[in-house]
Amino acid sequence: MTRVKAAIIGSGNIGTDLMMKMIKYPQNMELAIVVGIDEKSEGLAMAREHGIATTHEGLEGLRRHPLYKEIGIAFDATSAYAHKVHDEALRADGIQVVDLTPAAIGPFTVPPVNMSQHLDQPNVNMVTCGGQATIPMVAAVARVSDKVHYAEIVASVSSRSAGPGTRANIDEFTRTTARAIEVVGGATRGKAIIILNPAEPPMIMRDTVFTLSEGADEDQIRRSVADMVAEVQKYVPGYRLKQEVQFERFGDNNKLKIPGQGEFTGIKSMIMLEVEGAGDYLPSYSGNLDIMTAAAKATGELLAARRMAAA
């Protein structure tokens, strides 16, 4: 069966790493064209070396290209501002969009958690790197619990892997991730913190997830977390638990007060993760960026499979 042709818009680090993943691990998609705005960018040069069509004239260059009419899926790795323009044009032309920017026009999407709900959406959003790493763990606790009252994530990433866009949008990162912890992860209230670690040599991404839940015991949570880690590892091999899940119980004799929510009885879980990148283009310590491109590719493969089945 013919694979679905795809385009990548944005030839920077994220777009180039995604390109290399699509070249190295082809499944349901065929990368047809890479779009940039700098004719001399490394990403476009690498695309040409691999025999992939390119344009340095942005979205308009893509729309004028003979391959455009064959594109079924487009990945946008530009900026939130540019994405709003791109989405309108691509949607009008019947192209499904996987959004790697903070624009969040489409629904938040984390492949092993809620991708099956969004296969027919014209636009899906990849949340944030911290969201892709930690929301599966919140969801793992939520699916075996009656309620997750609160979930907090702390994402620590190498300072070297945080470009100017990340640094300029720290507040947006925390707000978006916290909201997705609630909407996708299933927590009543979510909070997100990001730390830029200046250590040399650079540290790989590390994440800590805290949940306050009721209605499940430690063994249920432990098994659910292990199962979810295995699901994420299918597309991010470097995703793993740093140590066994830690638990603390709160009962009627030692209730925990949650600001704004009242007293809590149940289980506090602490899940510690690390994410090592595959090194397809970005260095392996950039697990925070790698998990975004890997999740985007996994999402695209599912969208493409849906299109192929309907053809």
From Swiss-Prot:
<feature type="binding site">
    <location>
        <begin position="161"/>
        <end position="169"/>
    </location>
    <ligand>
        <name>NAD(+)</name>
    </ligand>
</feature>
<dbReference type="GO" id="GO:0009056">
    <property type="term" value="P:catabolic process"/>
</dbReference>
<protein>
    <recommendedName>
        <fullName>Acetaldehyde dehydrogenase 1</fullName>
        <ecNumber>1.2.1.10</ecNumber>
    </recommendedName>
</protein>
<dbReference type="Pfam" id="PF01118">
    <property type="entry name" value="Semialdhyde_dh"/>
</dbReference>
<dbReference type="GO" id="GO:0008774">
    <property type="term" value="F:acetaldehyde dehydrogenase (acetylating) activity"/>
</dbReference>
<dbReference type="InterPro" id="IPR000534">
    <property type="entry name" value="Semialdehyde_DH_NAD-bd"/>
</dbReference>
<keyword id="KW-0520">NAD</keyword>
<keyword id="KW-0560">Oxidoreductase</keyword>
<keyword id="KW-0058">Aromatic hydrocarbons catabolism</keyword>
<keyword id="KW-0614">Plasmid</keyword>
<dbReference type="InterPro" id="IPR003361">
    <property type="entry name" value="Acetaldehyde_dehydrogenase"/>
</dbReference>
<dbReference type="Pfam" id="PF09290">
    <property type="entry name" value="AcetDehyd-dimer"/>
</dbReference>
<feature type="binding site">
    <location>
        <position position="288"/>
    </location>
    <ligand>
        <name>NAD(+)</name>
    </ligand>
</feature>
<feature type="active site" description="Acyl-thioester intermediate">
    <location>
        <position position="129"/>
    </location>
</feature>
<dbReference type="InterPro" id="IPR015426">
    <property type="entry name" value="Acetylaldehyde_DH_C"/>
</dbReference>
<feature type="binding site">
    <location>
        <begin position="11"/>
        <end position="14"/>
    </location>
    <ligand>
        <name>NAD(+)</name>
    </ligand>
</feature>
<dbReference type="GO" id="GO:0051287">
    <property type="term" value="F:NAD binding"/>
</dbReference>
<dbReference type="InterPro" id="IPR036291">
    <property type="entry name" value="NAD(P)-bd_dom_sf"/>
</dbReference>
<comment type="similarity">
    <text>Belongs to the acetaldehyde dehydrogenase family.</text>
</comment>
